[in-house]
Design a protein with these regions (language model features):
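Short, solvent-exposed loop/turn segments at secondary-structure boundaries
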Residues: 39-42, 70-75, 109-114, 175-176, ...
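Catalytic-core regions built around general acid/base machinery
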Residues: 42-55, 120-128, 179-183, 215-220
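Histidine-acidic metal/acid-base catalytic patches
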Residues: 1-2, 9-24, 55, 145-165, ...
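Short, small-residue-enriched loops and turns at beta-alpha junctions
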Residues: 36-38, 65-68, 105-107, 142-145, ...
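Conserved beta-strand positions in the central sheet of alpha/beta enzyme cores
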Residues: 29, 59-60, 99, 137, ...
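Glycine-rich, proline-tolerant flexible connector loops at the mouths of alpha/beta enzymes
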Residues: 29-52, 102-110, 201
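Short, conserved active-site loops that position catalytic residues or coordinate cofactors/metal ions
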Residues: 23-33, 59-66, 101-102
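Active-site acidic/histidine proton-transfer and metal-coordination neighborhood
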Residues: 11-14, 50-56, 69-162
Length: 245
């Protein structure tokens, strides 16, 4: 099992790489987001060199608020393109998976339509990712995609997709962790850990909230999970992240 951490997109990627390498993490969960880490604003050569110098592995992560379920085709296509233009770089830095985030859509659109539009978007992205030997991974999100049924529709409609289990999301407003793990254990390739009080996605240090981490870890061990776990702990004080490791 490998333990990693995610860069804060408000900071330069190099700062995260230095901290994670010095703190004994195995990889960076590299999110390419604004304001300082989007593919359009980073110095790709410098980031590539810094990753190589750090010795860290890379897991790919994309902007979490892209409108993949927009009923407006041009907006949906822009969201798709925003992910596609990251794929070559993710391949170059050694990533094998790239996380995308399903969009619950807008209230005037039926949930089943939002699910279908996400599936359409992810099929296009997945096909492009395959050209770079990358696997697209879908993360459970607050909203309609906190539930098994819509996620299952995505993963069966686009068979190449794999599952990313965010534990912090899974316990919000009704604990669905066991349900999600049981349903998607065969497709599970990536996990996020962060603590909360089960009301908001707080991204607290492990042990600071209400999540039963003994139960979580035992359940993952019980299915033989041995891949990547990212500590998605957000704080201005990096000691909280390091203490969670």
């Amino acid at each position: 099992m490998k333990i990693g951490a995610m860069n804060n997109p408000r900071l330069e990627i190099g700062e995260a790489l230095a901290l994670f390498a010095a703190s004994g993490f195995d990889y960076i969960d590299l999110t390419l987001e604004y304001p300082k880490a989007h593919i359009d604003v980073i110095d790709k050569k410098a980031v590539l060199a810094a990753i190589k110098a750090s010795g860290l592995g890379v897991v790919g992560h994309t902007t979490y608020y892209l409108p993949f379920a927009s009923p407006i085709n041009s907006i949906r296509q822009a969201a798709i393109e925003d992910v596609i233009k990251t794929l070559g770089f993710f391949k170059e830095v050694g990533a094998r998976t790239v996380t995308v985030h399903p969009d619950s859509g807008v209230g005037t659109i039926e949930p089943k339509t939002s699910v279908s539009l996400n599936a359409l978007s992810f099929k296009i992205i997945s096909d492009e990712a395959a050209k770079h030997d990358l696997t697209v991974v879908v993360e459970n999100m607050p909203g309609i995609f906190s539930n098994v049924e819509p996620l299952n529709t995505l993963l069966t409609t686009v068979p190449a997709l794999r599952f990313h289990l965010d534990v912090g999301h899974a316990v919000l407003r009704g604990n669905k962790f066991k349900q999600l793990l049981g349903m998607f254990k065969e497709k599970l390739v990536h996990v996020h850990f962060s603590d909360n009080r089960t009301r908001e996605d707080d991204h607290m240090p492990i042990g600071a909230g209400n999540i039963n981490w003994t139960e979580i870890v035992q359940a993952l061990k019980g299915i033989g999970y041995d891949a990547t776990i990212t500590l998605e702990v957000f704080s201005n004080d990096p000691r909280y992240l390091v203490a969670s490791r």
